[in-house]
Amino acid sequence: MIASLAAQSQQPVQPDLKALKVRQQGAWSSGDYAIVGTTLQIVGEQLCEALDIRAGQKVLDVAAGNGNATLAAARRWCDVVSTDYVPSLLARGRNRAAAEGLSIR
């Protein structure tokens, strides 16, 4: 019994990443993220300003949410690719970009 427990404790624990991703997607898409995202809009602008992002640069926004940093970079004429694992948030970002006449991918 002790030898069996010792052998089990030496095996690394493998997290179920797929299940974790599904739970996180559910959490981020369950509420009205637009309310939270709107309060963070200035952060996207400040981030682009702090990084001195300029026209023509390539920008990858990972965990883009509803696109605050994506749109801030696109307003600076950057080539922006936006990604998030919550499709509804990406759709909001695309809609916001379209409303401003901005090009994002």
Where are these regions (language model features)?
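Conserved class I S-adenosyl-L-methionine
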Residues: 6, 11-54, 68
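Class I SAM-dependent methyltransferase SAM/SAH-binding core
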Residues: 58-105
